[in-house]
Amino acid sequence: MPRSCCSRSGALLLALLLQASMEVRGWCLESSQCQDLTTESNLLECIRACKPDLSAETPMFPGNGDEQPLTENPRKYVMGHFRWDRFGRRNSSSSGSSGAGQKREDVSAGEDCGPLPEGGPEPRSDGAKPGPREGKRSYSMEHFRWGKPVGKKRRPVKVYPNGAEDESAEAFPLEFKRELTGQRLREGDGPDGPADDGAGAQADLEHSLLVAAEKKDEGPYRMEHFRWGSPPKDKRYGGFMTSEKSQTPLVTLFKNAIIKNAYKKGE
């Protein structure tokens, strides 16, 4: 009785396992281990033979599909039926129905192309034209203001025929230019004026550089050329902090009004 109960429970367990694996492996029942199920040892051997087929690690294909290679490379699958798959030159709204067919042709032609190099399309050794993906440039959002970063704006370099004279004219303000011209005119009136013109200009340039450096080191830089650099006193704090003299007529008016009211009440 115990053996019959054990064999019955084993047969029931095997039936459940085989029912679960019926759709997975058809050759498991046809193996030699599962032909004779009368003894317990044959039952365990059949279970061991069918157990690897029930593991979740092996793909579940009907028949012997796992032993055959795939007919199509899954990496070649391109979602050409979606409009965002490719951004080609032929993909435009005005193309209509012909644009979809051309896009599919581009997709089918570009399936066999390998990864593109970073430097762009290169000519092939056999002289053939590059594919549609090789000739396509990277999509850059230049029509947006954040698409292409704008570098620092550079001012144009001014080139003058007279080197030292025009450099000094650009470097110094108007009063320095007037002083330099006056000194040069005075030096030109002397007997050796034309001969010492170059030396005098060099000396004037050095002197003006020293004066500009001294003025720069005198105190903090004040933006007087801007309207907010140093506002007038009557405009500070929105005009509320004004002097007492400007309020004198208003105070006099109030005093006269108070005196008039007191005089009328006294009468």
UniProtKB/Swiss-Prot annotation:
The modification Phenylalanine amide is found at F87. Glycans are attached at T71, N91. GO terms for biological process: calcium-mediated signaling; cell-cell signaling; cellular pigmentation; generation of precursor metabolites and energy; glucose homeostasis; negative regulation of tumor necrosis factor production; neuropeptide signaling pathway; positive regulation of adenylate cyclase-activating G protein-coupled receptor signaling pathway. The modification N-acetylserine is found at S138. The modification Glutamic acid 1-amide is found at E134. The modification Valine amide is found at V150. It is linked to Obesity: A condition characterized by an increase of body weight beyond the limitation of skeletal and physical requirements, as the result of excessive accumulation of body fat. Obesity, early-onset, with adrenal insufficiency and red hair: An autosomal recessive disorder characterized by early-onset obesity due to severe hyperphagia, pigmentary abnormalities, mainly pale skin and red hair, and secondary hypocortisolism. This is Pro-opiomelanocortin. It comes from Homo sapiens (Human).
